[in-house]
A protein has these predicted regions:
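Periplasmic/extracellular loop-to-transmembrane helix junction in inner-membrane transport proteins
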Residues: 3, 31-73
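N-terminal signal-anchor transmembrane alpha helix
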Residues: 8-32
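C-terminal transmembrane helix and the adjacent membrane-cytosol boundary/short C-terminal tail
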Residues: 90, 181, 224-258
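Generic hydrophobic transmembrane alpha-helix motif, especially the helices
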Residues: 101-136, 143-144
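Glycine-rich helix-loop "coupling/hinge" segments at transmembrane-helix boundaries
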Residues: 117, 145, 193-230, 253-258
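Short cytoplasmic-facing helical segments at TM-TM junctions of multi-pass membrane proteins
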Residues: 140-179, 211
Length: 258
């Protein structure tokens, strides 16, 4: 168990790593000596502050966040439901396997181009973020269900324990580490895929459109500023979702213990 001193050391180490990275960036910017090729961190920070106070910035953040978060939430719910069904009825897994394998194998760019034919561009980030993270969440939840203690499940069936009670007391605790690991991998992927869809589809009012415009007009500082915004949103969203899931599992454990 880490002590307060250990935590303080880790905090200083992280801060030192950030300072080192910024120093390397600034040194590279001085070496290149071209704001077009590589603006320094101070220049990018200035552009970020200038963009952050505009209404267009807030609209773009809200637009992309709602759609990418919505796609992830939809994938999480559907993956959980279908994994439960596949765990209970093996035929469901057999029927779903070709689709899951296809989604894993097909390049995201192919899905984006197809989706541009099928739907409005405003729905593109939601659909692509959903599609890219669904297989990760589904396979992880299914693996968690299969890791549940078989003897406990047999005993529960022998004593005719209701399935809902089996779910709360046996299956969900087994799923927890697999689901958290899957979410940790899928959350970043949802933002990468969603923003890539926005850039390729030039989705109006999105963060991806801002990246595209910055590239077209050779505004490298703006490009890096918008990239920093996307990274920050992805990190905050990941921490929020994982914290909510952990809290939900803790409440479930307390409920099962009473």
């Amino acid at each position: 168990m880490s002590t307060p001193a250990d935590k303080k050391i880790k905090t200083w180490q992280r801060a030192g790593a950030v300072v080192l990275a910024l120093s390397v960036w600034q040194a590279a910017s001085w070496t290149v000596d071209s704001a077009l090729l590589l603006p320094g961190p101070v220049t990018v920070l200035g552009r970020l502050c200038a963009l952050a106070v505009t209404a267009a910035f807030r609209r773009a953040v809200a637009f992309s966040f709602c759609r990418i978060a919505g796609g992830f939430a939809l994938a999480l719910v559907l993956a959980f439901v279908l994994a439960l069904a596949a765990g209970r009825w093996p035929v469901v897994e057999v029927l779903l396997r070709p689709y899951v394998l296809a989604i894993k194998a097909v390049p995201v760019a192919s899905f984006i181009i197809l989706a541009l034919i099928w739907m409005r561009t405003s729905a593109l980030p939601l659909f692509i973020s959903f599609l890219m993270v669904f297989p990760i969440l589904y396979t992880n939840v299914l693996a968690g269900l299969r890791s549940a203690d078989g003897q406990l499940l047999e005993m529960a069936r022998a004593f005719r324990v209701p399935w809902r009670r089996q779910l709360h007391s046996i299956l969900l605790p087994a799923v927890e580490p697999f689901l958290l690991a899957g979410c940790a991998a899928a959350l970043g992927m949802s933002w990468k895929a969603g923003v890539a869809a926005e850039v390729i589809g030039v989705v109006a009012g999105s963060l991806g459109e801002r990246l595209y415009d910055a590239k077209i007009y050779l505004q490298t500082a703006d490009l890096l500023a918008w990239t920093a915004v996307i990274v920050a949103l992805s990190a905050l969203f990941e921490r929020l979702v994982l914290a909510l899931l952990r809290r939900g599992f803790r409440r479930l454990e307390r409920g099962c213990g009473t």
